[in-house]
Amino acid sequence: MSTNQETRGFQSEVKQLLQLMIHSLYSNKEIFLRELISNASDAADKLRFKALSQPELYEGDGELRVRISIDEALGTITISDNGIGMSREQVIDHLGTIAKSGTKEFLNALGSDQAKDSQLIGQFGVGFYSSFIVADKVTVRTRAAGSDASQGVLWESAGEGDYTVADIEKAGRGTDVILHLRDDEKEFLSEWRLRDIIGKYSDHIGLAVEIQTKEYDDEGKETGTKWEKINKAQALWTRSKNEISDEEYKEFYKHISHDFADPLIWSHNKVEGKQEYTSLLYVPSKAPWDLFQREQKHGLKLYVQRVFIMDDVEVFMPNYLRFMRGLLDTNDLPLNVSREILQENKVTQSLRTALTKRSLQMLEKLAKDNIEQYQQFWNAFGLVLKEGVGEDFANKNQVAALVRFASTHTDSSEQAVSLSDYIARMKEGQKAIYFLTADSYQAAKNSPHLELFNKKGIEVLLLSDRIDEWFISHLTEFDGKPLQSITKSDLDLGDLADKEEEETQKVQEAEFASFLERAKGYLGERVKKVVLTHRLTDTPAVVSTDSDEMTTQMAKLFAAMGQQAPEVKYTFELNPEHSMVKRIADIADEAEFNDWIELLFEQALLAERGTLENATAFIKRMNKLLGA
């Protein structure tokens, strides 16, 4: 009998997710059982942890398990666990709302591409709501461990606009999820169909999965039912590696990550000696939707002596490896460890160092053994990995070796060139690794700063990610070679410079001295200086900054973060070989000369910044000079 019954509306995001999920996951509908068993496993883990300090929560029943039963007459499947259970407040919080930051943004990213939506929803983690793929009504009966039998809770919904919640009597702790199957989903009333799904998805979990099966006498007559354990019920990471199949590793990844896609690679290691721990680390094949939400917790599952302690433990991985998934099971931490204790713990620091090293080794091996798969990894997680160059001094060179760049060598926007690749192709006499930062690959590829390098056949790395200016400021050299921006006014080609060209340049500087003086006189304090340049072949002018000054891209980064950046004062460089520059140098009329210098300066600023402060004035001036 139920009391205190109320009907409540779903949070709007839940309604939207339910409709999208039912349609986009229909082809993969059997995962509902995996998700519900996974939830039961989590509930058992949470009870074990709380019972460390409150053993009375076991209520005399310490054999944790999940039981699955079928009622063909009623058309129901019941998934029952004796884990931690839920209070009325927890039921409303967990089953009526989605308490995840960025949920609206996530839902807005979903569209009409069913296959893509399926992957996205899988990454989001549908859990309990997957029940509605096969059921037109779901009933939940639950009681929190340690609460009175009268404090049971009933939750029921048809998966549409609302749900009902009420108080009930429930003798045993834990949760029963009763699925009232749709008429066209009766295939799941087959015991053997359920056995097959459990064998496929849930054999690896440490919780016993039992199914209610019929018993027969010698004559084949049904005599009753019994509970039969149908999974290994041994935590996968405690088993020997040679006993575990690739499929089991993949399914375990999906169990702990709630991702639908297979992982890219994994590493399972048992360490004995000064420290004793087992780690199972995975690199996902796709970036989760919330990867760049800093408030979203990312981390490993922590077990101490095979007892689950907590999820999303971030201290064992540096932030730039936040995409790593997996678990750590250690004997070197106390069972009552808290997040606060972990922060200050020497054991934690030692484990973090070891797990970081292991993760980077996994990526190094992937980059060496499978270029195509590593490219897939880089496309998904490259932006995050770049953060490591500035955040992890101890592993800076290892991280830098894993970074991939677009380059003038490939004529492609794909970031596939490593620093080692670049060094192997360096020209004789070349002492530096040259790079260029810009707003986009197209802007970088078409930058006038490349003209001399293209002419001489010198490779340049093209950086156009938003993080790149920050990233490159922390990477000043690699393998003994300095990294040098080609947009700097004091660019030095060293042994790559042409001696004959240098002599010609000296003559031109004398010829154009008065021209440069006139130009600087007009531009005044708007520029640092006006000089001739020999880095251009097709363009009349560029602007550049000194090596110790803030670059254009860094100033943009400051502005994007809402911070005040120092004003960038450029060197204005003019190409003496260009016909336009030669013509302007001969103009005697001061007003006309100034108009042309202004036009060239604005053109150079536009090429450098991508925008002008006064585009209308620029267009008027250009039209005026073209019509003259």
Curated annotation (Swiss-Prot):
| Any GO MF annotation of the entry | ATP hydrolysis activity
Gene3D superfamilies, alphabetically? 3.30.230.80, 3.40.50.11260, Heat shock protein 90, C-terminal domain (1.20.120.790), Histidine kinase-like ATPase, C-terminal domain (3.30.565.10)
Compartment(s): Cytoplasm
Q: Which sequence ranges form a coiled-coil region, renumbered to this chain? A: none
Q: Does the keyword Repeat apply?
A: no
Q: Where is this region: A?
A: 1-339
Ranges for region C: 557-628
Record keywords: ATP-binding, Chaperone, Cytoplasm, Nucleotide-binding, Stress response
Tell me if ATP-binding is a UniProt keyword of this record: yes
What CDD domains does the annotation carry? HATPase_Hsp90-like
Show the segment(s) annotated as B. Answer: 340-556
Cellular component terms per the entry's GO annotation = cytoplasm
Q: What does this protein do?
A: Molecular chaperone. Has ATPase activity.
**Subunit structure comment from the entry:** Homodimer.
Q: Which family does it belong to?
A: Belongs to the heat shock protein 90 family.
- Name of the protein: Chaperone protein HtpG
Q: Which organism is it from?
A: Glaesserella parasuis serovar 5 (strain SH0165)
